[in-house]
Amino acid sequence: MKFIDEALIRVEAGDGGNGCVSFRREKYIPKGGPDGGDGGDGGDVYLIADENLNTLIDYRFEKRYAAGRGENGRSAGCTGHRGNDITLRVPVGTRAIDNDTQEVIGDLTKHGMKMLVAKGGYHGLGNTRFKSSVNRAPRQKTNGTPGEKRDLLLELMLLADVGMLGLPNAGKSTFIRAVSAAKPKVADYPFTTLVPSLGVARVGADRSFVVADIPGLIEGAADGAGLGIRFLKHLERCRVLIHLVDIMPIDESDPAQNISVIESELYQYSEKLSEKPTWLVFNKIDTIGEEEAQARAQEIAEQIGWEGDYYLISAATGQNVQNLTRDIMDFIEANPREVAEENTEADEVKFKWDDYHQQAMQNPIEEDWDDFDDDWSEEDEEGVEFVYTRS
């Protein structure tokens, strides 16, 4: 299935139903009074996270999603039915953004999390609400309010503990294959990886972490060169970044310069992302001798002013890979993910209906019936006719 990590859709909540102007007309009950019911509330639009989905391809072609409109009120004090809600299933890790205001509505980071993205309109009031001691036959009502309508940008951001950075052909996909059961495509040409992929690295029987591989970056990626930087968003939720460097590039480029290019592109994309913990890992040491690799790595680290530790591995042969994964696992366990306490069930906000009704009644709509009277006529289905006789 094709990997789609962005989708722009239109969500429309249902409008509230209008109130009804009606009067009770029944045999033996003269002047029965108002009995117009309220309308129904409009339906809402929700997003829910589903761990069984891994792409937004379902929203690539179908762009508009509308909830049901609330029914209008009816006579006999009957309230209209509420409009039907709709729930859209999206992958875990999806972020919802209002495309007009760029407001982040929320992130769905756990399976089953549910988020309201468009609120339905409130119901209108029937003429029964306007009955009073001085207004026995009210002909006022209110209409329902419109539901929310939004252009919603959905962004899928992979949830991983470790993110891989590097130029094309640095060996990122080979590393994923070495530490996990994932089998991303590996070849001897640039941009073999075209879409992000995930792998689960197991360290022992009950210890594991998730690693994300994204397409390689090149100089000018921030300006759209290569595959651009659109996939860097998948690293925003990682706890540590692994910067994989080819210690002896086949194109004879300078590894120190290559490191600077990646750091520059990362900073241009997001200053916050560039401040994440980053480990420097030199790959393909099997292509040169171990002593030469040590000396070359030391020289590169001095050129870029690297003050932290660095690793030398060969993802192709597995040399030193186990030590690296063990240290990554220890770091992840020592630095648990900082997640704000989120209620999986959204706090229910109780709408102040009394205040809404009071405000709505200040600006009612008055029905003007040219031939309105409360007396019975032959056109009425049923009722009581008053016959006055002179005694």
Swiss-Prot record:
Enzyme class at the top of the EC tree: hydrolase
Subcellular location: Cytoplasm
GO MF terms held by the record: GTP binding; GTPase activity; magnesium ion binding
Entry keyword Acetylation: no
Protein transport listed as a keyword: no
Cofactors (names): Mg(2+)
Intrachain S-S bonds: none
GO cellular component: cytoplasm
GO biological process: ribosome biogenesis
InterPro entries assigned to the protein according to its UniProt record, in alphabetical order: G_OBG, GTP-bd, GTP-bd_Obg/CgtA, GTP1-OBG_CS, GTP1_OBG_dom, GTP1_OBG_dom_sf, OBG_GTPase, P-loop_NTPase
Pfam families for the chain: GTP1_OBG (PF01018), MMR_HSR1 (PF01926)
Limits of the OBG-type G domain: 160-333
Entry EC no(s): 3.6.5.-
Database matches in NCBIfam families: Obg_CgtA, PRK12297.1, PRK12299.1
Protein name, per record: GTPase Obg
